[in-house]
């Protein structure tokens, strides 16, 4: 089960892939912070940037855009009470009152930590459940 994951690690940590992921996160935060633009829209708008890239680099960049936009939506939600992405609507309920009390930095820290934990947990769940689900779907014919 973990053999494919261990086989993929050298590719993930190549400098071009790391740079593309970091660039994707920065672009994603900027896109997520703009109210009205979701992570999916950000990927759709920036997908032409990936046409000239190696497929692994492009996928890493798109994953970075998605994850960055998920956090980026919390910035205007906390500071302005305007959710940047649909997923950050609930952040306005707790984050904006914290910002009104002068705890905006703490609210943004909580948002980034919860975004990172949620991303890691969902990645583990995906890696665990994808192979059995693939076998089930192949059984349909």
Where are the regions a protein language model picked out?
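Helix-loop-helix hairpins and the membrane-proximal interhelical loops
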Residues: 1-56, 131, 135-138
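Juxtamembrane transmembrane-helix boundary signature
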Residues: 60, 64-93
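Membrane-embedded alpha-helical modules
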Residues: 107-141
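Membrane-interface alpha-helices at helix entry/exit sites of multi-pass transporters
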Residues: 56-60, 97-114
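Transmembrane helix-bundle signature of multi-pass membrane transporters/permeases
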Residues: 29, 45-48, 62-70, 111-116
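A cross-family phosphate/adenosyl-ligand binding-site feature
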Residues: 3-7, 54-64, 72, 103-104
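Short helix-coil transition sites and intra-membrane helix breaks within transmembrane domains
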Residues: 31-41, 78-89, 121-125
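Hydrophobic alpha-helical transmembrane segments
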Residues: 18-22, 59-63, 108
């Amino acid at each position: 089960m973990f053999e494919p994951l261990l086989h993929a690690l050298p590719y993930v940590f190549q400098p071009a892939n790391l740079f593309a992921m970091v660039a994707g996160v920065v672009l994603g935060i900027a896109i997520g912070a703009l109210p009205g633009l979701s992570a999916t829209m950000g990927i759709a708008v920036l997908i032409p940037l990936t046409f000239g890239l190696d497929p692994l680099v492009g996928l890493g960049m798109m994953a970075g855009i998605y994850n960055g936009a998920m956090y980026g939506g919390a910035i205007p939600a906390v500071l302005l009470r305007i959710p940047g992405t649909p997923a950050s609507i609930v952040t306005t309920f707790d984050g904006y009152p914290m910002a009104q009390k002068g705890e905006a930095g703490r609210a943004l820290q909580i948002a980034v930590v919860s975004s990172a934990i949620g991303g890691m947990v969902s990645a583990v769940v995906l890696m665990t459940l994808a192979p059995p689900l693939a076998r089930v779907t192949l059984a349909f014919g």
